[in-house]
Amino acid sequence: LQQHWQQLYETSETLLKINDYERIVLVKNYVCPAIAIISKSLEHDEQMFRMVYDALPLKEGETEPMMNIVAWRANDTFISVVFPRYKHRPDCYFAEKEQQFLVSPGSLDMAGLMILPREIDFERITPTLAEHIMREVSLSDEAMHEVIKHICQHNVSSWKQEPTVSVGIVSAEKIHFRLNGSYLIDGELITGEQTVEYSKGEILWQSAYLRELVFTPKDQESSFSLDDVTIGLNFHWERKEVQTFLGTLHLIVDNGKIYAINELPVEEYLTSVISSEMSATSSLELLKAHAVISRSWLLAQIEKRKSLGKGTEHQEVSTVRTDNELVRWFDREDHTLFDVCADDHCQRYQGITKATSPHVKMAIDATRGQVLFSEGSICDARFSKCCGGISEEFQYCWENIRKPYLLSVEDKAPLGSVPTMDLTDEEAAREWILSSPEAFCNTHDGVVLGQVLNNYDQETQDFYRWTVEFTQAGLSALIAQKTGIDFGEIKNLVPLSRGKSGRIYRMRIEGTKLSYVIGKELEIRRALSESHLYSSAFVVDSYDIVNGVPQHFRLTGAGWGHGVGLCQIGAAMMGEKGYDYQQILYHYYKNAEVRRLYE
């Protein structure tokens, strides 16, 4: 264990982080479950050991949990590895004749130095048997899952006061900014126009080469303005503008660029986010619900970043490809240099560039510190524009994990109702999509839609049910362009698998040259639109058949977006109907509760 520690540590998963140097990690690539405590001080070492100790199961009749511990010192760092145990001795200890091995693993055995009192056992034991013995006396995977969950809860419960969030604003080889007010750097007051440039692997500022720069505001009113901040990245409204921010400006170097990071209190950040994403006309209860959702997602991201450690940001993409099928899902980008980015890929954050709505400030203050909780963890609170009448479940859009708080519900009273129709069935899905059943999000009320949609999106109000027409030439060219596959002429689009909301997550494209299966829902939406099809909850009708090939196609669909979690249009209507924010949240997030983490 000690010999290979550096390699094991690099592949470990952080469960709890005290600071950049002290943490609790799960050792992942070892023969048996192990938890390591990395510390530099006696105080933190005791604190983290107590967290691990309290997380371990206690057997009936025992006074303390079973474990082995191996500890050593590396320079000024103390490393303690805890091996949670299920039992004292393996079954082979009590076996008879040649089946017996007198092995009773202790701390050194669990750390990789197995001691056998009998020479006959020493000569006969194999690496496979040794591994089996260590696994047998250790906690099971299920028991370890509970231990890990218990340790991770300390990340949340330790937030007795408002946390700080770090937001990546812009990255470039050269950044120009203006300090509007006095900022401290190394005890010196700085103000006015500034330029930093990437040079020789460092930041060049005022003729000095530095690895990082931290500009700390002298007072709460001081702000800084960054030039050339991109908004709407990869969307049709993409552009650059000057944006102004409160809080600390942190400049760091990574991968040949300088990153400008804004560090500020969470509640201040949320006030800007909700003001940017929601209309000033939104009802107070809708704004409260969105404040809780945004805060939940943000704090979950902060915790996720702790487990990722430092490095270059990446997007989570999973692909399953065979000769005749491509199933791919995209999740939000994971940043490791900062907690979240400032663009729509995370949450739209524009500092104090745009006016803050007093209505939003009221909603933020009313829900201060509140998040959605489920099974001891902060909820990954997803949302979309319009569910189409029934919300979708997580596993049909992203990773094949069923999240207990992201279950399918009918978007109507009684709240949180399980769908009465099985929309995974093709006939039922067709009947549902071609009808217009009652739902909170089934509305053309301009006042309600104006709470959720910007002016551009309100040019059409056909979100609950919509149609798209294609010619044969248009559809075959579009699919070839978007997939990179020449199908020839398109003969059919065949739904193979649907989720609980009727959204297709596996679809076969049949052409005159070949057939191919694609998924999940976003991959399907991308293949059938220049940007994104409203949703993958659609049925296909083809007509004007010539030699077995349709000349026209009509897609009739339901909803806008992935449909998982809160339905924004539905939630806006609920607010208009008098439901409060907790009723709205509990309707869309089953098995969750609203909990206040800090005052």
Task: Provide a role label for each language-model segment.
Residues I151-E599:
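Conserved, single-site charged/polar hotspot
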Residues L1-N155:
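HIT superfamily nucleotide-processing domains
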